[in-house]
């Protein structure tokens, strides 16, 4: 076997709050990390935007830093894999490469009213059947329609082929390739409300409903294969970009959930629980999403997904919004300083509720406070809310799949919180397993890229590389679990339908 000890795969991980570049070796081990935060823009309540040009410059900077700071030359990089925040929508000029507007982030709720109008008009079923998604402001399609409706002349320019639309993967691939590649993979395309997941192509009927010209859309390519070539001016040599997947699909691949019925939960800004359902899409009867995991070697793998909007973002809100903590790391010790939540429940519906409720008009609320409530109780309620939301999703997932989960693999920043992971295992009643390499999103992108160029031979090799760091066994009595769920669901019920559609 060829000695590849001095060769690496570079993973570009463009997330909601930060952009990173991570170097992976043959054993799936990390050889270098560079990171830069991304500015969040909140122009109106419920609106969330990013500067697409800032994202590009940050991604380029961290890619260069990962190589430079670790003494790695461009010729040692056999492939680049990319993973990205999904649904976030960019519209740019094909000639200048300049964005026409700040990117509309997946958390943005400005099109909730439009989604209501489309639902009232009877279109929700068609979107659901074709795309596997619920008709919600979360996804890219209505965001793109908003941009075309509100930027003067944009729709006519789009019809003339002067503009390009893309999720963040498309935008960065365009920039990295010097404008030569306008592409996306099925995992990202399946999050737009514009993509037929059964035929794996853009859907003309859905495009017509949203008045979106086909000329805007990127070409569909495999998640693992010959995608684009990164121009030599960026990293010092031409390098193949051979792997792309949306962040949650990439994390599922990085967790090596490659067999039917395996599932993972990523605790990032939001929480995202995905289950592998094999080579055929599984329609959900419990308000989950059917989505494409990845496409390689002519085969498409499908997933069931439940999306929680406020995961780690709940902790950020405690820090930045309320000032209860000065750093996110403080929450575990603060929450552990009390024996339980003291009857306090936080429903973090700050941007509505995702699966399985899908209520864009729910709003955040605290219940059960007394004169004895302390900041520690609120901190604990915030952590527990992350686990409660994830448990709601898993219960719906088990009903859809007709089988119980044997274990849940976990990753993301909050997965390092032992108190949260133990509470999650207690609520679910199944073991929660944290891997040694928790950077599974970037690892999944690296695996997809490396498989395409032979750096790793096959999926069996990836399975052999996966190692557990810690296994959290459930220890909560069933009557206690049931009582906690009953109170949680009472709290959720009171937070629903709070805001007005206008």
From Swiss-Prot:
Reported regulation of activity: Inhibited by fructose 1,6-bisphosphate (FBP).
Record field: catalytic activity: glycerol + ATP = sn-glycerol 3-phosphate + ADP + H(+)
Gene Ontology CC, one term: cytosol
Keyword Transferase applies: yes
UniProt KW keywords: ATP-binding, Glycerol metabolism, Kinase, Nucleotide-binding, Transferase
Task performed by this protein: Key enzyme in the regulation of glycerol uptake and metabolism. Catalyzes the phosphorylation of glycerol to yield sn-glycerol 3-phosphate.
Name of this chain's protein: Glycerol kinase
UniProt organism field: Dechloromonas aromatica (strain RCB)
The gene coding this protein: glpK
